UniProtKB/Swiss-Prot annotation:
It comes from Chelativorans sp. (strain BNC1). Binds to the 23S rRNA. Residues 1-41 are annotated as: Disordered. This is Large ribosomal subunit protein uL15. The gene is rplO. Pfam families: Ribosomal_L27A (PF00828).
Amino acid sequence: MKLNELRDAEGATKARKRVGRGIGSGSGKTGGRGVKGQKSRSGVAIKGFEGGQMPLYRRLPKRGFTNIFGKDYNEVSLGRIQAAIDANKLDAAATIDGAALLNAGVIRRLKDGVRVLSGGEITAKVTLDVAGASKSAVEKIEKAGGSVKLPEKAA
């Protein structure tokens, strides 16, 4: 057997249906689109239209709103900060803030600030300057001998 003699097994492939190639073919003229009407024309796909049935996006209720004052924080776990320190990407002696985490590759881009969460463990004595931190994260950092600087809340 040679490469040029290779063939697909019998019944493995199915010939594609060539529509609109004469009425003798059985699928000529209208090409399986029926007769006239919007959907028989080319380029038609009415998004969200379900043939007169009430469309899904109108059957479901409106819900919620977008808070224009909402803040979107980068959430970083203590375990990821410790991993960056262990890999010598972060300096534990220096103050760790959003810019330092960005340069170390811990976060991809800085949003409205960084919020530290307590996932994982931290052993390094670090000083964090962040927009927010969970209570358990602050406890873990202070237990390791570090400190967290949070912004003052406006009264």
